[in-house]
Amino acid sequence: MVRLLVIIERSDIPMKTEIIKTTDVHWDEKVKHLGEIIRNGGLVAFPTETVYGLGGNGLNPEASKKIYAAKGRPSDNPLILHVSSQEEVSRLVEDITPLEKKLMDAFWPGPLTIVFPKKDIVPDETSGGLKTVAIRCPALKATREWIKECGVPIAGPSANISGRPSPTTAESVLHDMNGRINAIIDGGATDIGLESTIVSARSGKIVIYRPGGITREMLSAYGEVEVDKGLASPNMHPLAPGMKYRHYAPTAPLTVYVGDTEKVEQTILSFAEKKDKTYGYFVSEEMAALLPKDAVVFSWGKRSSQKEMAHRLFSGLLYFNAHPVDAIIGEGTSMNGLGLAIMNRLTKASGYHIIVESTQDR
């Protein structure tokens, strides 16, 4: 009897995801290895000052397709290109206006993404089919070293399953991406905790497509600033990354209350008296102090510190995935400063379920 041994290569077996720390004593050698992964068409999650990104060769259409597949992200949602310096931009874009150059000089390296008209070298798979491309230079030195070693711009949306909160630690990346990508660069917890601000500066004024760590007030020092009207619409066509589709959503439905502080407190406290569901509370320290001791609470910090709220925003949304509740009751903030970016994320996380409380409701 002749036995035939057939070996079948299974595509459903996940790859092994390795974790490499930026503090590794052999970091210089690891950077070369990580660069090789990218040049070979692989995917590497990487830290920035904002959130962790999911990186691939931004000039390789197949690598961009892999990014969309790993995230479960619609392919008409464009990807940001990350560069290690300003000098890398000119080969990717048609031209650079004086205002764009001013913004790069002022905020790069840092959490500002600028939308440019792209050259053909940037594939449609990366730009989401648009004739423009969004580019930024991250602040984290280790990440810039790695991008330089790669020799190509890195296409990098946030390193999470599409629709979920963006990751601010390597552990959160591993939870979503283990077996989906080749490697994770562990640079510790991110500093800002919100994604970059995305702007266009083509028309002589600065248009904010996505608010972030660089605020409207900071940008106003360099020209007239306008907030794109599409930020308030759930059905708009994406002109820049992160403008379309539900984002940042925890597993449980989220409702956010803003407005008159006393009225917001009364409304949130009323849920603590209800027994129909298990509620979680994503609120300020001041509000948390008023809730029952046995309530499921994640405090985003003091009302006076939007920076702390921004830093803890995504970790708070992820907290309620690890501590399941039927519904989440959130407390919002004003639209000034970082509040514009914070409320943008909460608006999307809640599926546009924002309730404004006023003294007239009493």
Residue ranges and their predicted role:
Residues 12-362:
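Active-site-adjacent structural elements in enzyme catalytic cores
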Residues 1-14:
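N-terminal amphipathic/basic-hydrophobic helices that include classical n-h-c signal peptides
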